From Swiss-Prot:
The keyword GTP-binding applies. The gene is ureG. GTP binds at residues 14-21. Facilitates the functional incorporation of the urease nickel metallocenter. This process requires GTP hydrolysis, probably effectuated by UreG. GO terms for molecular function: GTP binding; GTPase activity; nickel cation binding. Homodimer. UreD, UreF and UreG form a complex that acts as a GTP-hydrolysis-dependent molecular chaperone, activating the urease apoprotein by helping to assemble the nickel containing metallocenter of UreC. The UreE protein probably delivers the nickel. Pfam families: cobW. It comes from Escherichia coli. This is Urease accessory protein UreG.
Length: 205
């Protein structure tokens, strides 16, 4: 029987291109000196997101596992999370004192959710470039995630999106749940996400 700490598991979901991998890169770089971190990525046929994080030197390569889900990526984070659970366990055995494991889902739609067996907290990432109507479309990612990240606010003028409309719709869809507007390239909103993780994950500094 292997002895290891049970890390905080944070599911990161959102549509393709919304900024999930970019979020993980900046979170890892900002938090790795204070916390022991690892990442599991999900791609259908490749390990591309794992390679991106490795090339960006977000973490050492032995702290990142890429899961090739095949078929439907939603199943691997909900109905049959066994591959992801095994990857989390493998990382926890490799690094006995892990504080956090981020589990990035494959690109999914607004209906994808994480199994409670796999994620203790969930962060859902959407982006302004998808249009200002995205928050009001709802779906579990929008309404039920523990934190909603609305990314790429810098693109709003270029796509004709009103951040005021998006904020009003988001507040209506998530009346008691937190959300944050971000520009991850410039780290706008990053500190709010980190504080959320520390607070809700009950992590000491």
């Amino acid at each position: 029987m292997q002895e290891y700490n049970q890390p905080l598991r944070i599911g990161v979901g959102g549509p393709v291109g919304s900024g999930k991998t970019a979020l993980l890169e900046v979170l890892c770089k900002a938090m790795r000196d204070t916390y022991q971190i690892a990442v599991v990525t999900n791609d259908i046929y490749t390990q591309e997101d794992a390679k991106i994080l490795t090339r960006a030197e977000a973490l050492d390569a032995d702290r990142i596992i890429g899961v090739e889900t095949g078929g439907c990526p939603h199943t691997a984070i909900r109905e049959d999370a066994s591959m992801n659970l095994a990857a989390v366990e493998e990382l926890a055995i490799r690094h006995k004192n892990l504080d956090i494991v981020f589990v990035e889902s494959g690109g999914d739609n607004l209906s994808a959710t994480f199994s409670p067996e796999l994620a203790d907290l969930t962060i859902y990432v959407i982006d302004v470039a998808e249009g200002e109507k995205i928050p009001r479309k709802g779906g579990p990612g929008i309404t039920h995630s523990d934190l909603l990240v609305i990314n790429k606010i810098d693109l709003a003028p270029y796509v004709g999106a009103s951040l005021e409309v998006m904020e009003a719709d988001t507040a209506r869809m998530r009346p008691v749940k937190p959300y944050v507007f971000t520009n991850l390239k410039k780290k706008v909103g990053l500190e709010t996400i980190i504080e959320f993780i520390i607070d809700k994950g009950m992590l000491g500094r």
